[in-house]
């Protein structure tokens, strides 16, 4: 008997199994190929806009993705660096081979984790409660909790031109039996599609005509636990399609599975295939392609922006029309893949299914796209499954606490009919959810769960103390416009003042940086760089942050008003049939969650609030 069984060894499965095992749960990870644990099936990169936030949040609570990325990274960049700190995002190119080897070895070393190379065929479910798993090897494993992290494997179907192949990924069998079995459980399910780009032999690329894109001169680590971070960095390159490329693609629309009706699943809106881009943006004469090394050896390059399911010979023809690729040799062709997913409104915020007790889902099975979104869900599913075994309160991150909270709340409350990816625009309180304050927001959770060490948490507490001390000093200390103070400001390269101001307003100036902060007062001289950066950020955005915190307090009042788990919405007089139907379907855990459901009116929320408060008084 296991405590937790995790089905699938992708990014969600890695985090789910690691979290459960590290929380002391006897855990089994079932995966089709042990060599492919943690494989980056698509692009060789981790992070990006909003996705970097997810990785930093994972790391803040003790997840693995940030550390693995730092070890396997071959280029590091901060995206949107010229914009505000709320929308900046960390991104790393990774050595794909090294990444999965590190991920696999980290799991194999965990004391409470067993890994078995076999495929789950059927779940053992009794009275709407999962009891275990039966595999393709006829093995039966019983468990208190099961977590599905199946990625694109559920009835996976690969498309290249007119050709179709049942597979979960190239070279790996689709999970047909499990996919068919899930259809019998009465769950709302759908079909989604994603795709991948061709890979090209480096010897066949003329890099001399391509634009170079280097990593940052002073790269920043993803993990706050990474020490002596000094990675070897490789350049990426930028190429461009042209009218000839577009003409080749247009002439073969009739062979594109996307347009022939061969593909039924809905594809990702924000990561379209090249044929979809040419069709949707027919007025554009060129599209950027990002040429990314797959490993530190740089023998193969991933052609980011060139996702396609056109026939093999067409892929070669259209790629060779791009400058620098006239002699390109494709080592691995692009393809589209369709797969089953469970509509995420079937889930609770813990990622447990509402209809099947003790069965959790994480990653692409929930309708998301992206390694980072998958990892975040896997981590939370592993944590909540473990907490449930211990009969402890679940960890449900609020929208004002973490992008992970936004991600899960969006999925569970709003659902999705297309592959969901994270954006900073999805977060109402993104100024509070900066990448670099993730450890301050979430570190205590990781420590309380036993996923962060005493040393790690002490480091976080020191930064929190420095931030509080530094900010209080800036807000309380006033500068008068005398000769001495103005001379000091001029020595820093800052404009003089003409009226009394507190130091926070001076530090909030766009020109004020960390080096100037150090000279402002001896209190800052001994503080570490991380603390100084956060003091600077909090000071610069102080009034905006204060406004967002006030908004959060209003939201908390609604979030704290809990709706009982088996609440009968029909018993509330004054609610329309439509509202009752939606509330019964979504089963919101709080009034705030109910407010996020489309079609739930303010009047209905008022009625519901009054009724629940009255019931609580009676109780």
From Swiss-Prot:
Compartments in which it is found: Cytoplasm
Gene for this chain: mnmG
Gene3D superfamilies from the UniProt entry: FAD/NAD(P)-binding domain, GidA associated domain, C-terminal subdomain, tRNA uridine 5-carboxymethylaminomethyl modification enzyme MnmG/GidA
Residues engaged in binding NAD(+): 267-281
Protein name listed in UniProt: tRNA uridine 5-carboxymethylaminomethyl modification enzyme MnmG
HAMAP family, per the entry: MnmG_GidA
Binding partners and assembly: Homodimer. Heterotetramer of two MnmE and two MnmG subunits.
Coiled-coil annotated residue ranges, if any: none
Gene Ontology CC terms, in alphabetical order: cytosol
Recorded GO MF terms: flavin adenine dinucleotide binding
SUPFAM superfamilies: FAD/NAD(P)-binding domain
Organism: Campylobacter jejuni subsp. jejuni serotype O:2 (strain ATCC 700819 / NCTC 11168)
Record-linked PANTHER family: GLUCOSE INHIBITED DIVISION PROTEIN A, PROTEIN MTO1 HOMOLOG, MITOCHONDRIAL
tRNA processing among keywords: yes
């Amino acid at each position: 008997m296991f405590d937790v069984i995790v089905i699938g060894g992708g990014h969600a499965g890695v985090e789910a199994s690691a979290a459960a095992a590290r929380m002391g749960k006897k855990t089994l990870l079932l995966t089709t190929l042990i060599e492919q644990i943690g494989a980056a099936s698509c692009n060789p990169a981790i992070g990006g806009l909003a996705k970097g936030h997810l990785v930093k949040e994972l790391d803040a609570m003790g997840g693995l993705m940030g550390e693995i990325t730092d070890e396997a990274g071959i280029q590091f960049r901060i995206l949107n660096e010229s914009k505000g700190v709320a929308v900046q995002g960390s991104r790393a190119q990774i050595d794909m081979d090294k990444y999965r080897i590190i991920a696999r070895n980290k799991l194999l070393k965990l004391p409470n984790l067993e890994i078995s190379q076999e495929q789950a065929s059927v779940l053992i479910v009794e009275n709407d409660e999962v009891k275990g798993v039966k595999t393709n090897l006829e093995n039966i494993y019983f468990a208190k909790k099961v977590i599905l992290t199946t990625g694109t494997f559920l009835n996976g179907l690969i498309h290249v031109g007119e050709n179709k192949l049942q597979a979960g990924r190239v070279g790996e069998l689709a999970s047909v039996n499990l996919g068919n079995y899930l259809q019998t459980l009465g769950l709302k399910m759908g079909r989604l599609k994603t795709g991948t780009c061709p890979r090209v032999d480096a010897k066949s690329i003329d890099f001399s005509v391509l634009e170079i894109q280097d990593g940052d001169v002073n790269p920043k680590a993803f993990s706050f636990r990474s020490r002596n971070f000094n990675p070897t960095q490789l350049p990426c390159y930028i190429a461009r399609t042209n009218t000839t490329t577009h003409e080749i693609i247009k002439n073969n629309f009739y062979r594109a599975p996307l347009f022939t009706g061969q593909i039924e699943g809905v594809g990702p809106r924000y990561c379209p295939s090249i044929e979809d881009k040419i069709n949707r943006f027919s007025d554009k004469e060129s599209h950027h392609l990002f040429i990314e090394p797959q490993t530190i050896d740089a023998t193969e390059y991933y052609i980011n922006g060139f996702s396609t399911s056109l026939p093999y010979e067409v892929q070669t023809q259209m790629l060779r029309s791009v400058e620098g690729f006239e002699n390109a040799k494709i080592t691995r062709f692009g393809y589209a893949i369709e797969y089953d997913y469970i509509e995420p409104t079937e889930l609770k915020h813990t990622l447990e299914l509402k209809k099947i007790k003790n069965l959790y889902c994480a990653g692409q099975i929930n309708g998301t796209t992206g390694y980072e979104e998958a990892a975040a869900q896997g981590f939370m599913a592993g944590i909540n499954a473990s907490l449930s075994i211990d009969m402890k309160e679940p960890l449900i991150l609020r929208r004002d606490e973490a992008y992970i909270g936004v991600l899960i709340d969006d999925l569970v409350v709003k659902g999705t009919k297309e592959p969901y990816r994270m954006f900073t625009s999805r977060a109402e309180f993104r100024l509070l959810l900066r990448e670099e304050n993730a450890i301050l927001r979430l570190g205590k959770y990781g420590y309380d769960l036993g996923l962060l060490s005493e040393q790690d948490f002490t480091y976080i507490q020191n930064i929190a103390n420095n931030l509080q001390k530094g900010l209080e000093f800036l807000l309380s200390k006033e500068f008068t416009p005398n000769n001495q103070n103005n001379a000091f400001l001029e020595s820093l390269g800052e404009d003089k003042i003409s009226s009394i101001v507190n130091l926070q307003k001076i530090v909030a100036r766009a020109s004020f940086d960390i080096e100037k902060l150090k000279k402002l007062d001896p209190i800052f001289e001994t503080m570490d760089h991380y603390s100084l950066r956060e003091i600077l950020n909090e000071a610069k955005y102080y009034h905006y942050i204060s406004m967002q915190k006030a908004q959060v307090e209003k939201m908390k009042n609604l979030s704290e008003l809990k709706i009982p788990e088996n609440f009968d919405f029909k018993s509330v007089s004054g609610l329309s049939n439509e509202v009752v139907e939606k509330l019964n379907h979504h089963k919101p855990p709080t009034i705030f969650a109910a407010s996020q459901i489309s079609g739930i009116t303010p009047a209905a929320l008022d009625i519901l609030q009054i009724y629940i408060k009255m019931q609580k008084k009676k109780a």
